[in-house]
């Protein structure tokens, strides 16, 4: 949804746009920032880099793998057209979803207020649109 006019956003070359002409460009790292400049309270919103690094190490060690597999199985059985991971962090669950063959035709999206987290998610999950 467009943060300016609340119309639907569509994927366009280089980012996203709504029918009213509001455009949101994709950063070179592969994410799109939908937070309007006047609504930014801090350039460092969300988790600091060190917390993201620790979380990534913890998740990549497999501690939440059973949960991730159950989530993938549940969503694959539902056959959705798209999935939005709100608060996706660095994209751990999105990576699990993107790796599932049964979800290959599903549009995957991730959002997070932490600029560093969404940058990491976009870098680690290229088939996913990160906003």
Give short role names for the model-derived ranges:
Residues 90-103:
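Conserved SAM-binding loop of SAM-dependent methyltransferases across substrates and taxa
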Residues 48-67:
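Class I SAM-dependent methyltransferase Rossmann-like catalytic core
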Residues 126-131:
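Conserved SAM-binding strand-loop segment of SAM-dependent methyltransferases
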Residues 121:
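Conserved SAM-binding loop
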Residues 80-89:
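Conserved class I S-adenosyl-L-methionine
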Residues 1-44:
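N-terminal auxiliary segments of SAM/dcSAM-dependent transferases
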Residues 112-116:
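Conserved SAM/SAH-binding beta-strand->alpha-helix loop
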Residues 61-79:
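Conserved alpha-helix/loop element of class I SAM-dependent methyltransferases that forms part
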């Amino acid at each position: 949804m467009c943060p300016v006019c609340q119309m639907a956003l569509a994927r366009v070359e280089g980012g996203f746009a709504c029918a009213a002409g509001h455009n949101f460009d994709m950063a070179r790292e592969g994410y799109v920032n939908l937070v309007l400049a006047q609504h930014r309270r801090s350039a460092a919103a969300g988790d600091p880099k060190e917390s993201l690094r620790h979380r990534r190490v913890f998740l990549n060690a497999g501690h939440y793998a059973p949960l991730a597999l159950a989530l993938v199985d549940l969503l694959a059985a539902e056959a959705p057209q798209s999935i939005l991971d709100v608060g996706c962090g660095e994209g751990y669950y999105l990576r699990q979803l993107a790796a599932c063959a049964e979800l290959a035709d599903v549009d995957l999206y991730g959002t997070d207020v932490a600029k560093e987290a969404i940058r990491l998610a976009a870098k680690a999950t290229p088939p996913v649109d990160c906003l």
